[in-house]
């Protein structure tokens, strides 16, 4: 679209990113109330875990889910005006976003239909994630930058590892892990989307640096040709996420649902793959990693000892059970997420 207009100003990444962000945010504010009302009329309410915190059963009844629809609608409409639709990285990201959102939508729909928190068959769900991640990572491997199969390590200037074709299963692991960890973290009002905003904001900075030859050379990071459109995409995602947080902040008027969490996690995971920030992403998304580990530890230990390490998993519910209010958990986790992001960004200079 910006090429057709032929305006010099629209060739600047910073300008397009800024207005993609603003457009997506304003669209969310305008259409948010309408979408929330529509979801309520369709009775698409959040189905709560019966084994979750007891107070959630009374506080969160009747809140519509599938809020990911609001985010992605705003992102895509905004991008229509500001992005080069034929950029290969955008096409890959678009496939990831739509495919994982559809998988999450099916999961949400089945939960509502069955009126319990059991959605898609876990086997079917993981098969779907494997299929979509395999397609997208294979596309990246064959059509991506010359650095595509190389893993770069934070803190070390010249330490890197070329995985060759093994990068495909490695990338699939990153994508599926990111998708599921974001999904696990989406348990409190504003928690997952707030942390996603922190991660997205950091990736905007990394994408901008990687898209510039001068900055990439100075920081000794790969220069990714075409990454400038990722900056615009992430800007739109940032705006849509801020707009969603407007309605998802405590007390929430809408929940993200698997429609949003599975897809946003996968999208940010794919962005990390494109930007050659796979290891850095583990630091950047540190809260999500810890949340996932808490579930794994809880399940493994209980299976072998019948004892629980945490009062409840994921970790945010453990702190609720310790007496923290929902807002205390959310804001403190945001602060920790911001610290992880600062550490991750600082490694770019440490190299």
Curated annotation (Swiss-Prot):
Molecular function GO labels: metal ion binding; phospho-N-acetylmuramoyl-pentapeptide-transferase activity; UDP-N-acetylmuramoyl-L-alanyl-D-glutamyl-meso-2,6-diaminopimelyl-D-alanyl-D-alanine:undecaprenyl-phosphate transferase activity
E.C. designation(s): 2.7.8.13
Compartments in which it is found: Cell inner membrane
Reactions it catalyzes: UDP-N-acetyl-alpha-D-muramoyl-L-alanyl-gamma-D-glutamyl-meso-2,6-diaminopimeloyl-D-alanyl-D-alanine + di-trans,octa-cis-undecaprenyl phosphate = di-trans,octa-cis-undecaprenyl diphospho-N-acetyl-alpha-D-muramoyl-L-alanyl-D-glutamyl-meso-2,6-diaminopimeloyl-D-alanyl-D-alanine + UMP
Membrane topology, from the record: Multi-pass membrane protein
Sorted UniProt keywords: Cell cycle, Cell division, Cell inner membrane, Cell membrane, Cell shape, Cell wall biogenesis/degradation, Magnesium, Membrane, Metal-binding, Peptidoglycan synthesis, Transferase, Transmembrane, Transmembrane helix
Membrane as UniProt keyword: yes
Transmembrane regions listed in the UniProt entry: 17-37, 63-83, 85-105, 124-144, 158-178, 190-210, 230-250, 254-274, 279-299, 328-348
Broad enzyme group: transferase
Annotated GO biological process: cell division; cell wall organization; peptidoglycan biosynthetic process; regulation of cell shape
Chief location category: membrane
Biochemical pathway: Cell wall biogenesis; peptidoglycan biosynthesis
Reported cofactor(s): Mg(2+)
Cellular-component GO terms for this entry: plasma membrane
HAMAP family given in the database record: MraY (MF_00038)
Function as written in the Swiss-Prot or TrEMBL entry: Catalyzes the initial step of the lipid cycle reactions in the biosynthesis of the cell wall peptidoglycan: transfers peptidoglycan precursor phospho-MurNAc-pentapeptide from UDP-MurNAc-pentapeptide onto the lipid carrier undecaprenyl phosphate, yielding undecaprenyl-pyrophosphoryl-MurNAc-pentapeptide, known as lipid I.
NCBIfam families: mraY
Family to which this protein belongs: Belongs to the glycosyltransferase 4 family. MraY subfamily.
Annotated protein name in UniProt: Phospho-N-acetylmuramoyl-pentapeptide-transferase
Organism: Borrelia turicatae (strain 91E135)
């Amino acid at each position: 679209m910006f090429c057709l207009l032929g305006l010099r100003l629209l060739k600047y990444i910073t300008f397009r990113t800024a207005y993609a962000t603003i457009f997506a945010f304003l669209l969310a504010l305008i259409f948010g109330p309408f979408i929330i009302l529509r979801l309520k009329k369709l009775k698409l309410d959040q189905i709560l875990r019966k084994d979750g915190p007891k107070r959630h059963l009374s506080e969160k009844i009747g809140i519509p889910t599938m809020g990911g629809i609001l985010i992605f609608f705003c992102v895509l409409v905004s991008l229509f005006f500001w992005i080069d639709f034929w950029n290969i990285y955008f096409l890959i990201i678009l496939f990831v976003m739509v495919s994982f959102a559809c998988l999450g939508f099916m999961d949400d729909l089945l939960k509502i239909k069955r009126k319990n928190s059991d959605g898609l068959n876990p086997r079917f769900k993981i098969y779907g994630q494997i299929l979509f991640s395999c397609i997208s990572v294979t596309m990246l491997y064959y059509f991506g930058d010359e650095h595509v199969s190389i893993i770069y390590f934070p803190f070390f200037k010249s330490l890197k590892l070329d995985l060759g074709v093994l990068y495909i299963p490695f990338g699939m692991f990153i994508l599926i892990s990111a998708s599921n960890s974001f999904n696990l973290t989406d348990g409190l009002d504003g928690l997952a989307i707030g942390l996603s905003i922190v991660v997205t904001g950091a990736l905007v900075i990394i994408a901008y640096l990687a898209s510039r030859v001068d900055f990439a050379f100075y920081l000794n990071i790969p220069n990714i040709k075409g990454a400038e459109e990722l900056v615009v995409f992430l800007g739109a995602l940032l705006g849509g996420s801020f707009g969603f947080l407007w309605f998802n902040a405590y007390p929430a008027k809408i929940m993200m649902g698997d429609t949003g969490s599975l897809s946003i996690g996968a999208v940010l995971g794919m962005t990390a793959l494109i930007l050659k920030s796979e290891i850095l992403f583990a630091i950047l998304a540190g809260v999500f990693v810890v949340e996932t580990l808490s579930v794994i530890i809880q399940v493994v230990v209980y299976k072998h000892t019948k004892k629980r390490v945490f009062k409840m998993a994921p970790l945010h519910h453990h702190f609720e059970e310790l007496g923290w209010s929902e807002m205390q958990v959310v804001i403190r986790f945001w602060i920790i997420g911001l610290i992880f992001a600062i550490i991750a960004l600082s490694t770019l200079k440490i190299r």
